[in-house]
Amino acid sequence: MLELEQADGSRFFPLRELMVQAGRFVDRLHDTHRQALVGGQTESVLVVGHNAILRALILQLLGLNATGFRRLRMDNASISVLNLSQAEGEPVAVQVESLNNSIHLGNGLPPSKGPRLLLVRHGETDWNREGRFQGQIDIPLNSQGRNQARAASDFLSTVSIQRAYSSTMARPRQTAELILACHLGVPLTTTPGLVEIGHGRWEGCLEEEIAEVWPELLADWKRAPHTVTMPDGENLQQVWDRSLATWHTIVGGLSPEETALVVAHDAVNKTILCALLGLSPADIWMVKQGNGGVSVVDYPQGLEGAPVVTCLNLTGHLGGVLDRTAAGAL
């Protein structure tokens, strides 16, 4: 941790002090808006600050320590959106809707140094719209999903992409193909390591249908998702292991200045982003992934260095700063 010597000879740890300052602010934020948090009321709080304190604030909200400071990036005039809620008797729950969004400035993606990966969630399907658990059922994009993929293609049209990867399933593959329409000659490699979590007997079901047969398991999925193995399906640790192994293989194959497109699914993207942020499988609800949303991961110190989550879940190309994509099941 950074240590400085002050004029009087005493030692000063600026990052440690920032984390303490951010922690006090979070406590005050919770106390000031307790009624809205517990009552489910909608309140929007604008916080304007400097690069370092905003990163410290996000770490505190996510329950992370200062070791994650360099995992985040905050550009000038960027917007990050975090959603807070609290059930009676439970701690405050935090969801990162987006991080370091500067699309409104009209400058495209932030500049990069070193390898870059563009992690995209597939466009919408009919089952997303209906709220059905689709898992490994191979549902294609609907018309809205194709429009989302084309919007992502337009947004990324000026980005130089050298490699592209997707899940073997139709919805991410179709999304990747539409994005690559602006990047002729870039081959698409599909890999089973990026397929969606297997929901087993939940696949094709609406939440209320699952609640009739597996009410306790569904409640656990919402409260403690890392403890659940789907009936005849997968658990998050299995998805975590295969998605991270695939991610590391993709990263390891990049040259120093290459950019790769990776198109996958909600749970897969969440496990990857949680790992990069220093979170665990228990924390996947902390990260939002909208259909057609773009996240950016950089390796500014090279492939052997630590990754930086430069942007998370950018959806401005789909119509606004806030994520208005379907809130359907995985």
Residue ranges and their predicted role:
Residues 50, 122, 145, 265:
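Short, conserved phosphate/pyrophosphate- and ester-handling motifs at nucleotide-, phospho-/glycolipid
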